[in-house]
């Protein structure tokens, strides 16, 4: 039976972590073999609603805090589990604000340059060919 790579269910993982965890989380993902990562700076808050700081002696409630958001697309529940575990292990401090991880099933992925879709769109090319 022929294996159709486009029948693979793609899973998108979004992780929002502390800004200072960027390098460690990126390294952990690379170390387990994740080869496609999008990361960008965001601001946000959880149920704690940010934090309080003192500016010129006045208490100021900071409503949002700087974070890093990672977006990763994987091709199996095993990769989803491995990716989540790597992020959790690396980003954990045990304090409020460690972040959140969300997963979604993707309807489609398209590589703009080649037109490849689904599983084929997220694979790293072999530049030796």
Give the ranges of each region predicted by the language model.
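Positively charged, small/polar-rich N-terminal and surface patches that mediate targeting and assembly
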Residues: 1-129
